[in-house]
Amino acid sequence: MDYTPRLQPARLIKRYKRFLADVVTPEGETLTLHCANTGAMTGCATPGDTVWYSTSDNPKRKYPHSWELTETQQNHWICVNTLRANTLLYEALLENRVEELSGYSDVKTEVRYGTENSRVDLLLQAPDKIDCYIEVKSVTLLQHECGYFPDAVTLRGQKHLRELQQMVSNGKRAVLFFAVLHSGIQQVSPARHIDSRYAELFTEAQRAGVEILCYGSTLCPDGITLTHKLPLLG
């Protein structure tokens, strides 16, 4: 996924009201950015970090600038825009870069499924294959050399695990895909210490046959690419 035009840098002053952040540009101008991330963003929003932002040409947007990446003071790169994870996997599927999900001729997005009024992130179909339902999660929380999901209690994420497990019960293929969008993360684990119920449902879903895939990425102001498989812990 390319950023066109290239992202612009600024220094983070603070994040507030969940969806907003104030930054100062190299020229000294203060801007308010939109932040498309409802999580805690632990370790991703430290004042003084370098923020990389995009600018929309939509005149109707109240906040035309969007926070895309954080370059931390520890030299890690993090994609904080959770909307990018789906796009990254979609592009990787079209380019046949995820071996475990290859061989499907049709990729659909936001298809209704399940029993809890959900829309699946991606649905893969092919005449000779079982339908494959994929939920995509962005992993950005780094603690003790491990990446954790979620970074806050997520009822929505719990629902998705139930829906995926139901798809397996219905004879379909179901995949939980962790897109690791933090350059410092080399392994992934469910965050039992943050959302114990999510971790319980994660274990139940995995035992029921839901597949778990974790892929790392390369990140820079020019773009992001899913590149390599990462190990899953517990």
UniProtKB/Swiss-Prot annotation:
GO terms for molecular function: DNA binding. The gene is sfsA. Pfam families: SfsA (PF03749), SfsA_N (PF17746). It comes from the Bacteria. It comes from Pectobacterium carotovorum subsp. carotovorum (strain PC1). This is Sugar fermentation stimulation protein homolog. Belongs to the SfsA family. InterPro entries: SfsA (IPR005224), SfsA_C (IPR040452), SfsA_N (IPR041465). NCBIfam families: sfsA (TIGR00230).
